[in-house]
Amino acid sequence: MQRTIKSFFQPKLGAEVKTKEEKVKNDVQKEKEEPEKSVPERPLKERNGRALCGDTESPVKRVSKKSARVLESDSEEEEENSKVQATPEKMNNESDPKNDVKETPPSARKETPPSARKETPPSARKETPQSARKETPPSARKDAKSEGASEMNTSQDFVSPCSSKSIDSPLCSDSPGISPSGIPKRKTARKQLPKRKLEISPSESNPPKDDFDVKGAVKRQKKEAEGDIQQEEPMETSHNISMEEECPIKKETNPDVVQETISNADDPNIELVDQKDVVSGEKQSEPKCQEQPQPKLTSPTVEPKASKGKARKKNSPLPKKVKFSDKVSFKDNDSEEKSNEEKSDEEPQKKADSAKPVKQISSFFAPRKPAIKTEKREENLNEKNVTETSLEESPKPKKNVGSFFGASKQEATEEQTEYNPSKSKYHPIDDACWCNGQKVPYLAVARTFERIEEESARLKNVETLSNFLRSVIALTPEDLLPCIYLCLNRLGPAYEGLELGIGETILMKAVAQATGRQLEKIKAEAQEKGDLGLVAESSRSNQRTMFTPPKLMASGVFGKLKDIARMTGNASMNKKIDIIKGLFVACRHSEARYIARSLGGKLRIGLAEQSVLSSIAQAVCLTPPGRDAPPTVMDAGKGMSADARKSWIEEKAMILKQTFCELPNYDAIIPILLEHGIDDLPKHCRLTPGIPLKPMLAHPTKGIGEVLKRFDEAAFTCEYKYDGERAQIHILENGEVHVYSRNQENNTTKYPDIISRIPKIKKESVKSCILDTEAVAGDAEKKQIQPFQVLTTRKRKDVDASEIKVQVCVYAFDMLYLNGESLVKEPFAKRRQLLRDSFLETEGQFMFATYMDKSNTDEISEFLDQSIKDSCEGLMVKTLEQDATYEIAKRSHNWLKLKKDYLEGVGDTLDLVVIGAYLGKGKRTGIYGGFLLASYDEESEEYQTICKIGTGFTDDDLEKHYNFLKDHVIENPRSYYRWDSATEPDHWFDPVQVWEVKCADLSISPVHKAALGLVEDQKGISLRFPRFLRIRDDKKPEESTNSFQVADLYRKQQQIQNTSSTEKAEEDFY
C-alpha cells in the first residue's frame, strides 16, 4: 500500500529502484511514447469530471493530474511549514493540481530520500489553517527550502481535491525532498500560489474532501498497482496540465464550458504537439541552464504570477503549457547537474514572485475564453512574451463579457451617434454609419436633419442631404424611396390622400404615456419651448429602460407612419397612440424630435422639395447607382474643376426637376432612376393622365404699368381671374375622369356633377386629355358667379349628386395634354385653340375663360373694372407666343395677376384691437407668432373677434409686439370679449392697442363674431388674408372699426352686390 501511494504521487517512478540516469532516460522515453498510446484510450466521457474516478481509464487517475496536484500542494505547504506547521487538510483545499505537475520533475522526485519526507508528521500538517498559507511572507518561503521533508509530505497529501484523506498516510510523503531538483519545485509552487488560492472555492475546501478525495486516492492506488504508470506520464505535457487545472473549476462552472475544454484536450493533434514541445524544451534548455541559469529561472517564475487568475479567466491551457514545458526541462537538467548555484539564484526570484500575486486576485471573477483560441495565439511566443501577453490580455475577457450585455451594440450606437453627413470630403461607404446590405438606421436620418436644421445656407444643406443619399444609394438602394419621403415628410403621392391626422393633443398624450411623464407637464413644456418635438426628445432622453428596444430603421419608421395614416374606425385612435408610443420608446437621441414633428405635419428644418430634388440629382451624379453593390464609382465628379462640377450637377438637376414636373410621383421616378440613371429619365417618365401636375402660378403686380413694362412688345392676353378653386381635370383613355386640386389632392368625389358633364361637353376626337380649369360657385339661372365662401360650403368628400345645393361651373383656360401628346412645350396661343376645338361650351356648366387680346392701357383698365363687376378677383395677363410654354410647378413672370386688393382705391383698411396671441413655433419660438383681433361693438360695448393674423410682420415688429403685450397678459378673457372656443389664444390681453390691417376681402364666418347677426343671422364676418400695416397709436380701443362699419364694408364688395340683388328676389318670392 505504501509503495502504491508513493508511485501514485510520483508518476515517473517504476516498480523497481533504478539509478538516477536510468530514471531520467525512462522518463524521456515515456514522454515520447505515451501520447500516442494514451490518446485513443481516453474517451471523452471519462475525461469529463472527476465523478468517474472509479474507472481504470478515468483521467482522474492519471498520474498527470495527481502529480500536478501533489507538486503544487507541495510548494504551498513549503511556505506554510516555514511560518507555521501547516494543516494538510486546509492546504489540500487550496492546492492547484495543475501547478504541482508543472513544478515537479520526475528526477527530483526520485532522489528525495524517504527520511526527508517523513520529517513532518501528518498531524502537524492538519493544524495549519487556510489563512496561514495566504499570509506566508517571502521570507518564510526562503526558509522553507531547508524543510524539504515537510514540504514533500504536504505536497503528496494533495493528490487532488478528490483525495484529501491520503494526507494522513505517512507513506504519501515520498515526494522529492531537499535535493537540488526539489528547490525549483518549491519555487514554482510559490510562483503559482496566488493562482491556487483563486481557484479554490468554498464548496471544495471543506466537507467534500473527506468523502470524495479518499475514494479518488484509493482508486489511484489501485491503478498504480495495476501498472498504469506509463499511461499517466503524458500528464507532463502542458495540455494535460491545463486539463488538471480546470478540474476544481469544472464543478462550479457551466457544464457546456467544461465539455468544450475537455473536447479540446482530447484532440490528439494538440496533445502530440505539446509533448514535442516539452521534449524539445528539455533538450534546448540544458545549455541555457548552465550558461544563464538565472534568466531561465526568471521567466517561469514571473509568468505564473502575471498570468495568475488571468489564464483561468480565459479557460486556456496554453500559458500553462509553455510554463510547464520550460519548468520540466529545467528541472530535469537540475537533477542531472545538481547545481547549487541555481538554488541561490532562485531565492531572490522567489522574493520578487511573492510580491506580485495580490494584484491579480480581483480578476478572479472575470469570465474565461475558449482554451484553443488562446493556445494558438501564444504558442509561438517565447517565455518573456508569454509573461507580457498574459498581463496585457487580462482585460480582454472583461471586454467580451461587456459585449455579451451589449458592448458591441454600444460601439455601433456610438458610431451612429457620431454620423456627420455634412463633413467635407464625405465618403459614401467609409463615413456611413451602417454597412452594405443593412437597413438605413433612422438615427442617420435624424442626424442629417440635425445638420440641415443647424445650417441656414441652402447649398450646404443640399450637399449634406446628398451625402446621406449617396450612402443610401451605395449601401442600401432599396431604402432610398422611404428616406426621400421622410425628408419630404410625406407618405406617398399627394393624390393618394394618405394623411396622419394626428393632432397636437394626441401627440402630447402619446409622449406622456411613452415617457411616463404627466400630460400637464408635457403641455407646459411644449408651450414654453414652442416645439413638441423638442419636448419629446428631452422627455425620452431622461427616460431609463431595463432593456434596450430594437433600433429604429428608416424603412420601419416610414412603414409605421403609413400604418397610422391608413387606420380608420372608432378604435383607430387608440391603435395610433399605441404605434406612436412604440416609436417613442425606441427613439434614441434626436429621433424623438423628428418623429414628433413628422407626426405633427411639419419638420421645420427648412428643407423645401426643390432642395430635395437637387440633393437627389447631386447624389445620383456623384455616386451613380448600378447593379454592383456597392457601386464601383464613389465620386464621379472627382478631377473636375469647381465650376465644371457645379454646372454639370445643375444640368442633371434640371433634367430631374423637369421630369418630376411632368410625373410628380417618386414611386415611379426613383426605381427608374436607380435602374437607368438620370440621363434616361425623360425617356421613361412622361406626362401621364391620372397623375396630377403641379400647376403653373402667376406673379402679382402692383398695376397695369408694371404689366406693360414686363411684357414690353410681346403679345399678351388678359383673362378673368375667377374666384374659385383650381381644378385639374384628367380624362383617361378608358373613359375615367379625375379631378385634382392645385395641391394634387384627389377631389373626384367632391365634384360628381363635373364628372357627369365631361362626356357631354368633350368632342369625339378627344380620347385623353388634361385640362387646367377653375371650379366656381354660380347660379346658372341668374348667370352670376358667387363668392368663394359659397363654394366652401360644399361637402368635401363623397358628395351625392342628388344632395348638391351649391352648383359649380367649370371655367377652362388651358390644355396640357391631348390624345397621348404633351402640350406643355407648346405656346399658349396654340394650347388655347386646341382647348376650344376639343370641347363644347355649355352655359352655367362648362365655360371658357373670358379673355381680351389687347395691349392698350386704357382697354386693360376697363377690362379689369369689368372683371370686378363680374364678381372676379381681377385679371390674369399671359404671353401668347414668346416664352409662352406651360411651366409646371413654377410661379412664372410670364403669367401676371392683377387683383383688386393690390390696386389703389380698391377696398379699405380696418383698425382693429389686439385681444389675444398665440405662442410662436419654429423660428418664432419665444415670441408671439400670431394674434387674435377684434372689432368694437358700440351697442353691446364688447369686443368681437374678426380674424387671426400672422402675416405682414417683420422680425422687429414681432419682437416689439411681444415686449409690449407681455406686460398686459391676463389669465382669463374679459367678460366683454365675444369669441369662439375654436379661436382661443394662448394668452389673453387687455384691450390696449389698435392695429391698421388690410385684407383681400370680407366673408361670412360661423366662427368669428364681428357684426354678429347684422348681415346673416347667427353668423359674423371675418377678413380674408389680413396683413398687418402699422400700429395706430392715435386711436383708443373704443375708436377702432365698429361692427356697423364692418358690415358696411362687406356689403360694398362688388361680388356681394351682385348676389345681394338675387337674394332680395329670392326673399321676395319666398
From Swiss-Prot:
Highest taxon of source: Eukaryota
Classification via Gene3D superfamilies: 3.30.1490.70, DNA ligase, ATP-dependent, N-terminal domain (1.10.3260.10), DNA ligase/mRNA capping enzyme (3.30.470.30), Nucleic acid-binding proteins (2.40.50.140)
Site features described as Interaction with target DNA, chain residue numbers: 458, 743, 923, 948
UniProt cofactor(s): Mg(2+)
GO molecular function, one term: DNA ligase (ATP) activity
One Gene Ontology term, aspect cellular component: nucleus
Annotated spans, Disordered: 1-403
One GO-annotated biological process of the protein: DNA biosynthetic process
Residues annotated to bind Mg(2+) 2: 873
Cysteines engaged in disulfide bonds, as pairs: none
Sorted UniProt keywords: ATP-binding, Cell cycle, Cell division, DNA damage, DNA recombination, DNA repair, DNA replication, Ligase, Magnesium, Metal-binding, Nucleotide-binding, Nucleus
Residues bound to ATP: 719, 726, 774, 878, 897
EC code(s) of this entry: 6.5.1.1
Biased composition (Basic residues): 184-195
Catalysed reaction, written as an equation: ATP + (deoxyribonucleotide)n-3'-hydroxyl + 5'-phospho-(deoxyribonucleotide)m = (deoxyribonucleotide)n+m + AMP + diphosphate
Biased composition, class Polar residues, residue ranges: 151-167, 291-301
Chain spans, region Interaction with target DNA: 602-611, 795-797
Active site: 721
Positions in coiled-coil regions: none
NCBIfam families assigned: dnl1
Family recorded in the similarity comment: Belongs to the ATP-dependent DNA ligase family.
Name of the featured protein: DNA ligase 1
